[in-house]
Amino acid sequence: MAITGVLGYSGRYIAAEAERRGWRVVGLTNSAGRLPNPAGYELRPMPWSTGENVLEGVDVLVNTYWVRFSYEGAGHAAFSHAEAVENTKLLFDSARRAGVGRVVHTSITQPDTASELPYFRGKAELEQALAATGLPHSILRPAILFGDTPEESILINNMAWSLRHLPAVATFGWGKYCMQPIHVQDFAELALDEAEKAEPACIINAVGPETYSFRDTWKMLAAAMGMWRPVLPVPAWLGYRAAQVLGTLVGDVMLTRDEIAGLSQDRLAVPGATIGTRRLSHWLREHADTLGRRYASELARRK
């Protein structure tokens, strides 16, 4: 089984679950030598980094590769959604040429080829590209991942960091739009269940068992941490400017315009069945003392 991002976040949990089930794991990464490999996985470069087909002999490909936002700032290599789309198409083509038996691909809730948001539009384009390969596949659509450590749960951890450092926090508008976070271990188990299926194609909304409005997430998080902060509704433009200022202070991109728009359009929640048993409300109580003690930087992960 080949897994992208095996040294990163969700890929690491998927790899560990695969080994528990008896799979031999091959990691696809461009971070060899930069990130630790304590499990000692065999590592191969991403297909777009080499002229070789790195998927030869692979039975199943699990893809978690993506970028959260496009970036062209100083101090880091540029990356973009457009580049991630093209790279992933090359990955799918490599899988097709190598005769990979099944692909499990990580998408997003409510992808849309007509969206003005590159994140959701790109994810929809990739779902179509995967289907066009003719390979048996499963498409998993998570909204937000959390667990197992606070630093790995960037959104939740940095909301907690804001509560610890700011006199008030904000929602964009009234904050009634919802999120359905799924624990990374539940997601890993789902990915392996799908890897071992024989269905030709399926799409699963990989959302957790609890649904919260953005406003209620602030309140629940503050309550778990034993503190109170006013939650102020602000216009999206003002919230973005505040995120820019805070991002400058911590040397990171805290939140983008597109992410605010995706939240406000209620794209991170879907009706229907949910996946997994691990609840964010329980996890917050277990990790309340350590949440937000340190800011979790997206850009630092990419150095």
Predicted regions: what they are:
Residues 1-21:
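N-terminal Rossmann NAD(P)H-binding glycine-rich loop of SDR-like oxidoreductase domains
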Residues 4, 28, 64, 103-109, ...:
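SDR active-site strand-loop-helix element
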Residues 23-30:
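Conserved glycine-rich Rossmann-like NAD(P)H-binding loop of the short-chain dehydrogenase/reductase
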Residues 32-98, 109-113:
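NAD(P)H-binding glycine-rich loop region in Rossmannoid oxidoreductase-like domains
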Residues 97-102, 135:
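A short helix->loop->beta-strand "cap" motif at the edges of active sites that frequently abuts
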Residues 190-256, 266-303:
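Mid/C-terminal beta-alpha module of Rossmann-like enzyme folds, strongest
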